[in-house]
Curated annotation (Swiss-Prot):
GO CC terms: extracellular region
Positions of the pro-segment in this chain: 22-74
Function summary: Probable ion channel inhibitor.
Region (Disordered): 57-83
GO function terms (MF aspect): sodium channel inhibitor activity; toxin activity
Family: Belongs to the neurotoxin 14 (magi-1) family. 01 (HNTX-16) subfamily.
Entry comment, domain topic: The presence of a 'disulfide through disulfide knot' structurally defines this protein as a knottin.
Protein name as it appears in the record: U11-theraphotoxin-Hhn1a
Tissue localization of expression: Expressed by the venom gland.
Keyword Signal part of the UniProt annotation: yes
Start-end of Basic and acidic residues biased regions: 57-69
Amino acid sequence: MNTVRVTFLLVFVLAVSLGQADKDENRMEMQEKTEQGKSYLDFAENLLLQKLEELEAKPLEEDSEESRNSRQKRCIGEGVPCDENDPRCCSGLVCLKPTLHGIWYKSYYCYKK
């Protein structure tokens, strides 16, 4: 019975001592992985920041380009004389001859469609 106890005690001591060594090793590995993880996180954060800056800059460029190119030229409002050959009526208006009889300064005016 003593041999069983001694054997059990010996196995127990070996397991504890080897377990402690593994625990220290695991702790060191975890620290290394944590440091590597931080560097990966920093790299990923910088990459994400660059992408975000690119995305933020893109709409601003598009907006400024649109505002330069899509600006509507001055147009003529409703009931204002217009030129038959070069109508500059605002959107939704058409350059037409007036339907009423009378003396008009010009023969064409901007009317709603």
